[in-house]
């Protein structure tokens, strides 16, 4: 489940693809057929600097975030792979722009309850994400309380988990509050961190015989430790 360069042109930049692993495929099809398996994070922010949530600053932040976490700008396509059935495609050019009306939405609300109702509908109603749109952010400015903003980050579970999104959210607010920078992270280096979970298994390159041996040794060690615990109990 590693990335492969499949294209490079002036219009798209470099284009990379990789198959989804088993976990990602499960979330992918769960989202398509059941409309679930998406994550919505809701944060309440008070600011004294009105420019923080202007469209230009939020768009700049989202572009920078996609360049750090490139799966935010990926698309998913079903393939003929026998073991996975789908693949991610990341085009370098897509990470440097915002698709109008899709990735960033600036809205207004008159109460906190109104935003909570929106988030509930986002989770329980018709799915707002798709294989072509794996992430988006909604910014609600409170008309009844100037300076108060709700940030709702909506991401497909196939590209992130509950712990990973905490890092992403922290990075989002860091970029939002800092001056612009011209630094663009190396795409290949960032994609190297977005591999399938199977690639993180230290035993994946071992032969079947070696894996069985490792499993047997692990079972023996576990039983010895378990026996010691039982003996030490009063």
Question: Each PLM stretch: what is its role?
Answer:
Residues 1-203:
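Non-catalytic N-terminal regions of enzymes
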Residues 214-234:
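Flexible, P/S/T/G-rich "lid" or insertion loops adjacent to the active sites of thioester-utilizing
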Residues 209-212:
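Phosphate/pyrophosphate-binding loops and the adjoining catalytic core of nucleotide-dependent enzymes
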């Amino acid at each position: 489940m590693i990335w492969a360069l499949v294209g490079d042109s002036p219009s798209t930049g470099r284009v990379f693809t990789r198959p989804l692993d088993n976990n990602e495929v499960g979330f992918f099809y769960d989202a398509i057929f059941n409309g679930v398996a998406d994550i919505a994070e809701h944060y309440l922010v008070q600011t004294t600097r009105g420019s923080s949530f202007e469209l230009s600053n939020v768009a700049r932040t989202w572009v920078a975030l996609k360049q750090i976490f490139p799966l935010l700008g990926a698309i998913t396509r079903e393939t003929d792979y026998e073991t996975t059935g789908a693949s991610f495609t990341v085009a370098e050019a897509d990470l440097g722009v915002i698709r109008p009306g899709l990735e960033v939405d600036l809205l207004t609300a008159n109460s906190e309850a109104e935003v909570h109702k929106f988030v509930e509908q986002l989770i329980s109603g018709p799915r707002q994400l798709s294989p072509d749109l794996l992430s988006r952010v909604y910014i609600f400015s409170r008309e009844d309380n100037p300076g108060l903003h709700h940030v709702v980050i909506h991401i497909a579970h196939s590209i992130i988990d509950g712990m990973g999104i905490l890092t992403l959210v922290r990075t989002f607010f860091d970029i939002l509050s800092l001056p612009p920078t011209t630094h663009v992270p190396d795409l290949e280096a960032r994609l190297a961190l977005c591999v399938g979970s199977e690639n993180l298994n230290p035993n994946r390159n071992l032969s079947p015989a070696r894996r069985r041996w490792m499993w047997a040794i692990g079972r023996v060690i576990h039983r010895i430790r378990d026996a010691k615990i039982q003996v030490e109990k009063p």
